[in-house]
Curated annotation (Swiss-Prot):
Location relative to the cell: Cell membrane; Cytoplasm
Assembly information from the UniProt record: Monomer and homodimer. Part of the essential Sec protein translocation apparatus which comprises SecA, SecYEG and auxiliary proteins SecDF. Other proteins may also be involved.
Keywords carried by this UniProt record: ATP-binding, Cell membrane, Cytoplasm, Membrane, Nucleotide-binding, Protein transport, Translocase, Translocation, Transport
Stated name of the protein: Protein translocase subunit SecA
Family, as annotated: Belongs to the SecA family.
Binding site for ATP: 86, 104-108, 494
Gene field: secA
GO biological process: intracellular protein transmembrane transport; protein import; protein targeting; protein transport by the Sec complex
Enzyme Commission number(s) from the entry: 7.4.2.8
Gene Ontology molecular functions: ATP binding; protein-exporting ATPase activity
HAMAP family: SecA (MF_01382)
Gene Ontology CC terms: cell envelope Sec protein transport complex; cytosol; plasma membrane
Listed SMART domains: SecA_DEAD (SM00957), SecA_PP_bind (SM00958)
Length: 895
């Protein structure tokens, strides 16, 4: 089905490209006009553009002139002039599309065009990159263009304080990673005052490497979580038990689906080891999760592939898509603790979700979204379906001359790597730079050992050397360089033949102590000479490497996604340079073993094929394509499923966050609180009068319940007497009496404390209760989703059931917010400001919760990111029926 959709989406490609080409021609026609201007006149165009916008013109009206201004500014500040194809890419981005541009076509420079144009509105532009280094590097380099034209630019980094973040978001153009933008959104919706909030809206986002961020990383939501009180001792116990269980005897493993199942023999063995009679008895239910995680940690999570153990005994996740270490991130649902127990390192506490959103729903909040990548067309259907984004392939500035050699397939991994080492040594001896792609830290280190034995000097780039990533990649195109890398080499930094002059120049400026923000004038004055020196140092080597055939890219294994293979290939042959690529495969590679086991078995049993001779077979090539198609289809379904369930929560989140923002922005809650009182009293009375008539109702019990809510000023006898006897007492009469009594008591409360104090108390109470109840609701929704799949066994649609029960839970939460807010407002002991000499500060509501260590789950490899700041979780969740909750609330409100 996606293939058919893809064909339909590509049908109008030619017309779109022609339209974009006409835009480039319009810009070219204006070029000489802006070339003739001096710097001051060119800078003044920004003011004139803004005046024209204020007068009613649109951004589309300004596009040709604005693009021409940016092109001229880039030529003067960076020494770079936008090519026509870059103008076309910029126009595609402005129109809210994904521009598919080959590696080396200058996507970073392309982003300056729509970023400048859309920043003229004053609403801000966000440029999203894949890591902090690229965000800082691009902001620093392209910021010179923006500053020249009178705009401000900034960068959001993980180490920044809230006040620095707020200042960065106030800039016209803000660079940062998807995680930083997403977590700031969640933190803003956990803030206790508008002064703590840092973002100013979501106007226009340009996502660099858009397929990596919106596709690869979209399977796992962003989650902020805080420590829970779950015990850690069981992880160690079950790690020992898992070591005593045998695969295919006590449990079974499905590597393809990454699932495990405990068999009957295993259950009996676990029960014997624990000394219990029935593992599935309700009291033992939590132990099942510990058991499953322990076996998963043993069988499905491999050291130096899925994670590494640092020298200080910390388990660090390795990003499955990029090969980078995810510093501080942690698997959720107890998985990380199970791995820590397996490795025998200190076990850290589990976490409770405080705020969450998927990347899909975060980016769909932007008024306009656009993206750039070298590999988007294979996912055009998903981009259109999920984000309503079109994919526009932009022509290359120069014809691509890279030669993609056919795959070489060997019977086993040993023979494959022997051939790989031989091929690398041959190209290295000739002086041709070689980039070798591997799929894991383990494989990169294995190949490094083989190359060392063969006497081939090389550099390894994997999760363990991530801090040197940019410098290694930037120099990977130098003569004779051999770089062994995991997927991380596929993103961000260009591999330029002879070396990256811009990278060298930026590094040299930093070495001189020059900063574009601290010393902008000195920076601008020194830049041309430093850049010229860097360019001269690499030019001669560039020509020499070009004559040797350019960069040779060698892949040691096919990835699960065709895009990642294409990204690796795309490192070579940039800007019309020569290049070559080839993949070496074996029949025992994970992709073949898991998805085409029968074919692998048939080839392995053939005795006539020598191990050191590659297999040439169209059947093998088709099998590889089929396997990648299966994985891509499966991952697409996972992402769609994540989004379907989050859409349910997203609607609830929008309601809660909107209410929360009203409170923060100072909306008068007086009328809302009055409605709360009526609603809660109505609920109490309705529950007490659900059966029978006036003579049957237990008014004493009702009044006792109401007294736990507010100081009731009437008695049951007075109400009955006013009605003319029990027989005349109706539900409507009782409701009218009790609502009036509650409202009168609140009037007295307001008169006692003063209107100003009560308004402040209302804001603090509602905010605190809303936050706590929302956290409890997230926990309940998580719990609901965990088991909802079992409804399919009863012929029920799990999603429909999740929507139905989620709606019920949300309704119960809103009622609980009303009930607790009313109870606190009546019961909290408040010292009036006149007596205290300061603003009223009710205990527990006078300030935000104590700040504590939080966990941040990022959208890759199902991990969590740890950041040492954040709002603490409020008091524990209330449990039980309404009567039990009332008792708990009374205890909480005692001062």
């Amino acid at each position: 089905m996606p293939a058919i959709v893809e064909k339909v989406l590509r049908a109008g490609e030619g017309r779109v490209v022609k339209r974009l080409h006409r835009v480039a021609e319009q810009v070219n026609a204006l070029e000489s006009d802006f070339e003739a201007m001096n710097d001051e006149e060119l800078r003044g165009e920004t003011v004139r553009f803004r005046e024209r916008l204020a007068a009613g013109e649109t951004l589309d009206d300004l596009l040709p002139e604005a693009f021409a201004v940016v092109r001229e500014a880039a030529r003067r500040t960076l020494g770079q002039r936008h090519f026509d194809v870059q103008l076309m890419g910029g126009a595609a981005l402005h129109q809210g599309n994904i521009a598919e541009m080959r590696t080396g076509e200058g996507k970073t420079l392309v982003a300056t065009l729509p970023a400048y144009l859309n920043a003229l509105s004053g609403k801000g532009v966000h440029v999203i990159t894949v890591n902090d280094f690229l965000a800082e590097y691009q902001s620093e380099l392209m910021g010179r263009v923006y500053r020249f034209l009178g705009l401000t630019s900034a960068c959001i980094l993980s180490r920044m304080r809230p006040d620095e973040r707020r200042e960065a978001y106030a800039a016209d153009i803000t660079y940062g990673t998807n995680n930083e933008f997403g977590f700031d959104y969640l933190r803003d919706n956990m803030a206790w005052s508008t002064a703590e909030m840092v973002q100013r809206g979501h106007n226009f986002a340009i996502v660099d490497e858009v397929d990596s961020i919106l596709i690869d990383e979209a399977r796992t939501p962003l989650i902020i979580s805080g420590p829970s009180d779950s015990p850690t001792k069981w992880y160690g116990e079950f790690a020992k038990i898992a070591r005593r269980l045998t695969v295919d005897v006590d449990y079974e493993v499905d590597e393809k689906k990454r699932t495990i199942g405990i068999l009957e023999a295993g259950i009996e063995k676990v029960e014997d080891l624990l000394g219990i009679e029935n593992l599935y008895e309700s009291v033992n239910t939590p132990l099942i999760g510990f058991l499953n995680n322990a076996v998963k940690a043993k069988e499905l999570f491999k050291r130096d592939k899925d994670y590494v153990v640092s020298p200080n005994d910390e388990v660090l996740i390795v990003d499955e898509h990029t090969g980078r270490i995810l510093a501080g991130r942690r698997y959720n649902e107890g998985m990380h603790q199970a791995i820590e127990a397996k490795e025998g390192v200190p076990i850290q506490n589990e976490n409770q979700t405080l705020a969450t959103i998927t990347l899909q729903n975060f980016f769909r909040m932007y008024d306009k979204l656009a993206g750039m990548t070298g590999t988007a067309m294979t996912e055009a259907a998903e981009f259109h379906q999920t984000y309503k984004l079109g994919v526009v392939p932009i022509p290359t500035n120069r014809p691509a001359v890279r030669v993609d050699q056919p795959d070489l397939v060997y019977k086993n991994e040993q023979a494959k790597f022997a051939a790989v080492v031989e091929d690398i040594a041959e190209h290295h001896a000739a002086g041709q730079p070689v980039l070798v792609g591997t799929t894991s830290v383990e494989k990169s280190e294995y190949l490094s050992t083989l190359l060392t034995k063969a006497g081939v000097e090389h550099t390894v780039l994997n999760a363990k050397q991530h801090e040197r990533e940019a410098s290694i990649v930037a120099m990977a195109g130098r003569k004779g360089a051999v770089t062994v890398a995991t997927n991380m080499a596929g993103r961000g930094t260009d591999i330029i033949l002879g070396g990256n002059a811009e990278f060298l120049a930026v590094q040299a400026m930093r070495d001189k102590g020059l900063d574009p923000d601290e010393t902008p004038e000195d920076y601008e004055a020194a830049w041309p000479e430093v850049l010229e020196q860097a360019q001269a140092s690499v030019k001669a080597e560039h020509d020499e490497v070009r004559d040797l055939g350019g960069l040779y890219v060698l892949g040691t294994e096919r990835h699960e996604s065709r895009r990642i293979d294409n990204q690796l290939r795309g490192r070579s042959g940039r800007q019309g340079d020569p290049g070559e690529s080839r993949f070496y495969l074996s029949l025992t590679d994970d992709l073949m073993r898991l998805f085409n086991a029968a074919l692998v078995e048939s080839f392995l049993t053939r005795t006539g094929i020598p191990e050191d001779v590659p297999i040439e077979s169209k059947m093998v090539s088709r099998a590889i394509q089929s396997a990648q198609g299966q994985v891509e289809g499966r991952n697409f379904e996972i992402r769609k499923n994540v989004l379907k369930y989050d859409d349910v929560l997203n609607r609830q989140r929008e309601v809660i966050y909107a209410e929360r923002r009203k409170v923060l922005e100072g909306e008068d809650l007086h009328l809302q609180i009055r409605h709360f009182i009526d609603d809660v009293v109505t609920a109490y009375v309705t529950e007490a009068t659900a059966r029978g008539f006036g003579e049957d109702w237990d008014l004493d019990e009702l009044f006792e319940a109401l007294r736990s809510l507010y100081p009731v000023s009437v008695t049951p006898e007075e109400v009955v007497e006013a009605a003319g006897g029990r027989g005349n007492l109706t539900v409507e009469r009782l409701l009218e009496e009790m609502r009036a009594d509650a409202q009168a008591c609140y009037d007295a409360r307001e008169q006692e404390l003063g209107e100003t104090v009560v308004r402040d108390l209302e804001r603090r109470v509602v905010l605190s209760v809303l936050d706590r109840k929302w956290r409890e609701h997230l926990y309940e929704m998580d719990y609901l989703q965990e088991g909802i799949g079992l409804r399919a066994m009863a012929q029920r649609d799990p999603l429909v059931e999740y929507q139905r029960e989620g709606y019920q839970l949300f309704g119960a939460m809103t009622e609980a917010i009303k009930e607790e807010s009313v109870g606190y407002l009546f019961s909290l002991q408040v010292q009036p400001a006149a007596q205290a000499g300061a603003a009223a500060t009710p205990p527990g509501f006078g300030a935000p919760p104590v700040r504590q260590q939080l966990q941040y789950s990022a959208p890759t490899a199902e991990g969590d990111v740890e950041v040492h700041a954040g709002d603490a979780a409020a008091t524990d969740a209330d449990t039980g029926n309404r009567a039990q909750r009332r008792a708990n609330q009374r205890q909480q409100r005692e001062v």
